[in-house]
Regions:
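Membrane-helix/interface signature in polytopic inner-membrane proteins
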Residues: 148-181
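C-terminal binding/interaction regions
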Residues: 4-9, 124, 128, 229-266
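Loop-to-transmembrane alpha-helix initiation sites
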Residues: 17-20, 65-73, 92-96, 140, ...
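Transmembrane alpha-helical segments in multi-pass inner-membrane proteins
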Residues: 194-195, 199-250
Length: 269
């Protein structure tokens, strides 16, 4: 009922969660379209595991989690890009290798230092409630930066997504833009991990884009539709998790899954 929802919104942690969540969902959806089209959508998974490792080490050393995780994951994103572009190891294998190593390191560090406490499980499975005020402010600033970068550089991102060879021939610095997309994705993944958890963050990147592609024809329409889907599913997921006391991240993914099903049916007609 409305009164319950209004009651829910009176909590500061809920307000924080919704503001940060909507912004991060937008970032993930916009980047997701580009990543899915470039067949690079697994990078979200790889980076989230690296993020988990970084957060584990940060909490073991008593450092600020975001301050450690953001640079580490950005570095990993750039490395993964380099690996997948010019090496014998194919992109997906490189991602699998790096992500499983990072996850293993994270789990070992945690078990040696703190044990699997609540903070850790919130990184694995996500907890909207664990956002501190400082984290929320930082998350808002970073996600707005990601959105601005995407919007301002949209024509170039569009070009690099669709025809890298042609873009390179016409003098676009495709490597720079690929790196930019990777860096923006890295930031989004770290921000999203707090809400979605490391295990589910890639769905925030992939699902809205795939759903939008079922019904929309142009890149622009897909981007806008994907953004809308992402935000709506995020809000529905948070409401569901609040009322039924289910884990937030998983609830958001289920909302996305249902949406994907509906759009697939619509797209068939």
């Amino acid at each position: 009922s409305m009164s319950e929802i209004i009651n829910m919104l009176s909590y500061h942690f809920m307000q924080r969660a919704l503001i940060v969540g909507v912004l991060v969902s937008l970032c993930a959806a916009l980047l997701g379209v580009s990543l899915v089209l470039k067949r690079y959508s697994m990078i979200g998974d790889g980076l989230s595991h690296v993020g988990f490792g970084a957060l584990a080490i940060a909490s073991a050393l008593g450092l600020a989690p975001l301050a450690v995780a953001v640079p580490v994951v950005v570095l990993a994103a750039v490395l993964l890009l380099r690996l997948s572009q010019n090496s014998k190891i194919k992109g997906d294998a490189a991602i699998a290798m790096i992500s499983s190593s990072a996850l293993a390191i994270g789990v070992v560090v945690i078990s040696v230092t703190t044990g699997m406490n609540t903070e850790v499980s919130s990184y694995m499975f996500g907890s909207v409630l664990s956002l501190s005020r400082g984290d929320a402010v930082l998350s808002v600033i970073l996600s707005i930066a990601v959105l601005l970068a995407f919007t301002l550089l949209y024509p170039r991102i569009f070009a690099v997504t669709f025809d890298e060879t042609f873009s390179r021939a016409t003098g676009v610095r495709t490597d720079a833009y690929n790196t930019l997309i990777a860096v923006l994705t890295a930031v989004t993944v770290v921000l999203g991990m707090r809400m979605m958890g490391a295990l589910l963050i890639s769905s925030l990147i992939i699902f809205p884009a795939l759903s939008a592609m079922r019904v929309c024809k142009s890149f622009r329409a897909v981007v806008l539709c994907s953004a809308a889907i992402s935000v709506v599913c995020f809000i529905l997921g948070v409401l569901a998790s609040y009322f039924w006391e289910t884990p937030t991240g998983a609830s958001i993914v289920i909302a996305d899954l249902i949406c994907f099903g509906l759009f697939s049916l619509l797209g068939k007609k």
